[in-house]
Amino acid sequence: MKTAHWADFYAEKIKKEKGPKNIYTVASGITPSGTVHIGNFREVISVDLVARALKDSGSQVRFIYSWDNYDVFRKVPKNMPEQELLTTYLRQAITRVPDTRGYKTSYARANEIEFEKYLPIVGINPEFIDQSKKYTNSTYASQIKFALNHKKELAEALNEYRTSKLEENWYPISIFCTKCNRDTTTVNNYDNHYSVKYSCECGNQESLDIRTTWAIKLPWRIDWPMRWKYEKVDFEPAGKDHHSSGGSFDTSKNIVKIFQGSPPVTFQYDFISIKGRGGKISSSLGDVISLKDVLEIYTPEVTRFLFAATKPNTEFSISFDLDVIKIYEDYDRFERIYYGVEDIKEEKKRSFKRIYELSQPYMPSKRIPYQIGFRHLSVICQIFENNINKILNYLKNVQDDQKDKLINKIKCVINWIKDFAPEDFKFLLRSKFDNIEILKEDNKKAISELLDSLKKNFEVATEQDIQNEIYKISRENNIEPALFFKQIYKILIDKEKGPKLAGFIKIIGIDRFEKIVSKYI
């Protein structure tokens, strides 16, 4: 039977290729050399979705996330303060670089904490592994010794995909100088036991004991497969750059065999682009969009939905423009289908319901959450000037267990209007009348008639009733309906167009409508 979701397909593939196990290990990781961006998040959530699928099939899962923070600091990101100071730390381990923003003890840790803080919000709770601690505590001493003792085999595996072969005096390690802390070093000798001699460009020369030193690490293309073996990794995806022909994954799947392990099940995930960014995000973070930024516009459920509803090898854009409205509409439809409020063909229903399940940070609620369209909610938010209590008071039949998610959605709507909505989407209900336009008598008469008509049965009138009345009165007064609509918008929000007028008036309420239009008649 065809699986309901791509995550279920890979869960089955893992169990088939790795065989029955008490626990399956799935892995992800990143070098925290800058703000951990939403492209990095695609790997994390891809692993989480497969982990969920494994758990749903009855398997135990260990989800590890490696902070590759013992990598070299190669380049100063443009969005970091004190560029000159940071430049002095180039070629040192990232964990030694100070946090020039003043948040944490190190630059790397500041980037890590920012990401760790927001992962639980979207239901992701991996076991974090600090690779700098692993190396500085000599945890990998036996693996480093193994690599040195198998230098020839490792060189052959690396040379298979290199245009220029490694030199005879190459060693499968890199060393941070204990004097200047940089990796500007050359390995001079290994005694085939535990002693390694090196020299540094700064002039320092010394011998190190593999069992006790903090200064030796394996280079990336050896470190990665070594950890597959060490952590017993069964699944780890990678980006298209790693999966390119002759890329790091091709090399690593051969090197892991030298370490007497096997490569994990994998897949290639594609890149993410950003559509409609600007304003706050652009000015504060340059070209970097973080999970925090996305969660300001998308609820945790919709954030997960963006990835759960898209195959990992598909490139897609995260939108901050008007497409946000469509994305929320799509999610709401999946929600209605999941709870049986809306029906579709049976062959699609299973897939839709599974996507909705995997979009939830934790368990789906027992009943359907309070549904209100993003566009409609954006009108309500602006009418009530983003006052959440007033918005909740206006909305009917919101149950206590529905409030938290609804409030979160309201906050996302408010953020989107403030930072990304086009200007013609924004409005402010008129509250000052010191510079109002004087209406012609026939327009005054029509507006007065509309007010009187609406006051008679406003509570029971539908949006269609109000719409019909606007057209009726415009025709009776020989006013072109389009011009009459413009006049009403101008009175209410000082613009010639705005939200759908009948619904807009219904939300405003007859008292506020009368208070505004009475100033003109």
Curated annotation (Swiss-Prot):
Extent of motif 'HIGH' region: 32-40
The EC class name is: ligase
Q: Which keywords, in A-to-Z order, does the entry hold?
A: Aminoacyl-tRNA synthetase, ATP-binding, Cytoplasm, Ligase, Nucleotide-binding, Protein biosynthesis
Whether ATP-binding counts among this entry's keywords is yes
Question: Could you tell me which Pfam families the record lists for this protein?
Answer: tRNA-synt_1f (PF01921)
Give the EC number(s) listed in the UniProt record: 6.1.1.6
Q: Name one GO biological process term.
A: lysyl-tRNA aminoacylation
Q: Which CDD domains match?
A: LysRS_core_class_I (cd00674)
The compartments listed are: Cytoplasm
Please write the reaction equations for the catalytic activity of this protein.
Answer: tRNA(Lys) + L-lysine + ATP = L-lysyl-tRNA(Lys) + AMP + diphosphate
GO MF annotation: an example? tRNA binding
Which Gene Ontology CC terms are recorded? Answer: cytoplasm
Q: Which family does it belong to?
A: Belongs to the class-I aminoacyl-tRNA synthetase family.
Write down what this protein is called: Lysine--tRNA ligase
Q: Organism, per UniProt?
A: Borrelia garinii subsp. bavariensis (strain ATCC BAA-2496 / DSM 23469 / PBi)
What does the organism's lineage look like at the top?
Answer: Bacteria, Pseudomonadati, Spirochaetota, Spirochaetia, Spirochaetales
